[in-house]
Amino acid sequence: MTNNRARTEQANSALRIPSPLIAYPSAHRLQPSAQQHAWLTRPGSLTEALKALGTFSLTIMCEGKFAACPHDAVLLGVEERTPLWVRDVALCVNDTPYVYAHSISPYEATEPLAAWSTLRYRGHEPLGTLLYNDTGIQRSAFSWQAVECPDGMQHVNPAIKNGAPLWARHSCFMRLKQPLVIAETFLTAFWQHPSPQC
């Protein structure tokens, strides 16, 4: 009985997180403008690019161990409900959310001495300081799409008007054969900046 209870507790220890913004594709067939496409495919650290637009800050929206939702399971190539380490943050410029970043990796890959062990201890430090200073990390090409902001998540995009679609991108970082997928959704306020030049 004790062993059964322990297995049940272990299975339930990874809570289910709501699907990320990028899991809500727009019903409209849209093509990004030249400026939008430049940002959606921009290499290098997005954090550094945002710092050029004003005073940068990071707000942690959600972080911890969760069970993979269907969308995240597909992105990582794992079974649904596989334990993941999830980190959702708002990247802000002048205290306004500009980008919503959703980072996921298999939980076992974030354990001590594993490929992404330092993910659990980033705090308010952007991931970019880790990802672009390690020559052992490889990044995939970007995939991008227009997405809708569901009612339950509009608090992360207060500048939205008339339910206008948002643009999002994602890519996969590999280290020691372990994946870290980062999905970045550009919020409405980002495009309202006087000069979000890529």
Where are these regions (language model features)?
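N-terminal domain-onset segments
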Residues: M1-V86, A90-C92, T96-C198
